[in-house]
């Protein structure tokens, strides 16, 4: 059974802290590196993460979001500050609209955890990742990413087989249909 929203408080905060550190620690010379997301380099991945955070903040505030719309350049001159501003907006929206926490937080945890792994892979910082974040995200993904949901979206493939020795992040990536 999926953990309650209160059970996600610590891993969700840890995922956001982790992403803040990953973005802040990414140097300009790393922006053109490939990522596990074949269609994105580090710059495009960070743009997706920051722009996506702004969209999740809008959802948390009760606004409708067009997820199919292209994300404009969200990096700006200071990607870490832009991410922090989005996080502040998200937290404010949760404070003003607690009724949206259950709908938004688990999905954003999954997104933040898997893209944190992507960014860490691309910038050689996988050893810095908190396994508890991946474990909580995987629990949320197992609850939310049902076979019916997989049929309705192209964002996730079928689960990929992995060895029993896989790390929590590799298990999360494989469950989301990605080769770890």
Indicate residue ranges for each PLM-predicted region.
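Structured surface interface patches that mediate subunit assembly and partner/cofactor docking
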Residues: 2-8, 14-18, 25-38, 55-180
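Extended, alpha-helix-rich binding/interface surfaces that flank or overlap catalytic cores
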Residues: 45
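Short, conserved "active-site rim" segments that organize catalytic pockets and cofactor/ligand binding
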Residues: 49
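Short, surface-exposed acidic-centric catalytic microdomains
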Residues: 52
């Amino acid at each position: 059974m999926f953990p309650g929203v209160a059970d996600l408080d610590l891993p969700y905060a840890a995922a956001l802290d982790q992403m803040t550190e990953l973005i802040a620690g990414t140097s300009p010379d790393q922006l053109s590196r490939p990522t596990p997301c074949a269609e994105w380099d580090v710059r495009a991945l960070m743009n997706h993460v920051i722009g996506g955070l702004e969209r999740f903040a809008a959802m948390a505030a009760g606004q409708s979001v067009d997820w199919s719309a292209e994300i404009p350049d969200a990096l700006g001159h200071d990607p870490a500050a832009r991410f922090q501003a989005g996080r502040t907006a998200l937290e404010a929206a949760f404070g003003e609209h607690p009724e949206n926490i259950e709908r938004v937080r688990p999905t954003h945890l999954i997104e933040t955890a898997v893209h944190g792994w992507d960014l860490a892979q691309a910038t050689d910082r996988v050893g810095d990742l908190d396994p508890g974040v991946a474990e909580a995200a995987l629990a949320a993904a197992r609850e939310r990413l049902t076979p019916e949901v997989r049929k309705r979206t192209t964002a996730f493939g079928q689960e990929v087989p992995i060895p029993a020795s896989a790390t929590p992040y590799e298990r999360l990536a494989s469950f989301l249909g990605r080769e770890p």
